UniProtKB/Swiss-Prot annotation:
GO cellular component terms, A-Z: cytoplasm; membrane raft; outer membrane-bounded periplasmic space; plasma membrane
One Pfam family from the record: Peripla_BP_2
Fe/B12 periplasmic-binding domain location: 56-325
Modified residues (Phosphoserine): S290
Gene name of the encoded protein: yfiY
Position of the signal peptide: 1-20
Entry keyword Transcription: no
Official protein name in the record: Probable siderophore-binding lipoprotein YfiY
Locations listed in the record: Cell membrane; Cytoplasm; Membrane raft
Protein's job: Part of the ABC transporter complex YfiYZ/YfhA/YusV involved in import of the iron-hydroxamate siderophores schizokinen, arthrobactin and corprogen. Binds the siderophores and delivers them to the surface of YfiZ/YfhA.
GO BP, sorted A to Z: iron coordination entity transport
Induction (record text): Induced by iron starvation, repressed by fur.
Residues that bear Phosphothreonine: T302
Taxonomic lineage from the root: Bacteria, Bacillati, Bacillota, Bacilli, Bacillales
Amino acid sequence: MKKHISMLFVFLMAVMVLSACNSSESSSNSEVSSSKTRTVKHAMGTSDNIPANPKRIVVLTNEGTEALLALGIKPVGAVKSWKGDPWYDYLKDDMKGVKNVGLETEPNVEAIAELKPDLIIGNKVRQEKIYDQLNAIAPTVFAESLAGNWKDNLTLYANAVNKADKGKEVIADFDKRVSDLKNKLGDQTNKTVSVVRFLSGESRIYYTDSFPGIILDQLGFKRPEKQVELFKKQKDQFTFSTDSKESIPDMDADVLFYFTYKADNAKENEKWANQWTSSSLWKNLKAVKSGNAHEVDDVVWTTAGGIKAANYLLDDIETYFLKTK
């Protein structure tokens, strides 16, 4: 009898141990399952279904493409570069095999769906009207703006793809490069700098909240007093647009960088630029007469708007302030 009771006790203990193991395993599986998605706050609200480790990402802005590449991620699909067939020259090698899904202003929703993405990254300014369509295809995260501060957007994208630490590293590396360059520039940062862009029918002065403006400000450059006064009259500190050559004197500075938009209507834009740069007002600018008016690449200085372009812009600063002296 005692033998039977002993055997029964052993059996019950074994059942309890197995039950505990199964319960533990079930709990463990539940934790793994719950960790397969993440919650991300973005311009369109809060998404709680973002894959923990997305593998098939479609990106719908040029600056977003550069951000993903900097994070070590190659998207399966991306919108076409503003200039290039279909990518900017400096992105061609990195973007081999990536599907072109249309323009930033008009993504091809069907092409995106065919790629079966597990995450879509876009921008409220560009694609707010089709957010619901995109979100029905895959979890979709939107940045708020394209004003010029690419660091904010890169931080959001890094969080969305679960690479927040890598995002911080990318930004820290850029900031260190800026700091090192600022030290090399020394008192040259006391010079005033102006940034001008030509488009057909419109000429622009880019100020402190623009893509080049933010970088120049980080380097410590000043703006000419005329522009300081000009932008006091504006609500934004992004750009001043004009079609009157009488505004050319406002473009002057110790150093002037100018460029022409060539992604669309290139001939008309170049014709407009030539009309301005051949005028007597332009030729009489201090920067022009001193040989400190430099024509630079529109893609790098404003069109692309991403981390790679930002580094190329720093290359230009090194060239014109250090290497040509």
